[in-house]
Amino acid sequence: MKDGSFPDCDILPLGKLCIDGSYMGDMGRDSGFTKEEQKTMMTLWAVFRSPLFFGGELRLTDNYTLSLVTNPEVINVNQNSEKPLFVYNKGGIAVWQTKIENCTAVAVFNLSDEENRHKLKLSDLGIENVRAVRDLWARKDIPKCENDVAVSLKPHSSEFFEIY
């Protein structure tokens, strides 16, 4: 990415997309994404600082989808972080990071169609002297993380952390 630019991921087609989707055939009114894929999409938009332009039908939005697009910790990364940095793609796992306030936000993506376990080595991210790791989607701190974070990812899923 060049300075002064950002990846514009465009609209967030999450949840129900329209009131009458009969013209869409089998897909109907639904986005066609699994819950994990919806979370991955929101994580990607957040770490890229792309505009969070919701493309779903608000009147039909389920609680899960609403929890994704209104998560204040994820929105904070989207609104207040620096330019994202691609870290690596190894064995179907892609990692991006960005600086925010007094920590580093890290997004881990499973690009494969299989479940994938990954050990996120904090030294690979240039992070030392870890005080805390926070799971942004669970909105909880992860206990006892010093040198790495073990991640178990379903197909096409992601995890999103802040590391202090």
Model-identified regions with their sequence ranges:
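Carbohydrate-binding surface patches
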Residues: W45-F48, F53-G55, N89-I127
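Hydrophobic, well-ordered secondary-structure elements that form the walls
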Residues: V106, V133, H156
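Flexible loop/turn segments at secondary-structure boundaries
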Residues: G21, F54-G55, T61-T65, D113-N116, ...
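C-terminal beta-strand-rich structural cap/linker in extracellular carbohydrate-active enzymes
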Residues: K144-Y164
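Solvent-exposed beta-hairpin/edge-strand motifs
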Residues: S123-A138
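Generic recognition of flexible, low-complexity loop/linker segments
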Residues: S31-F33, G92-Q97, D148-V149
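Catalytic cores of secreted or luminal carbohydrate-active enzymes
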Residues: T40-Y88
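Glycan-recognition surfaces
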Residues: M1-F53
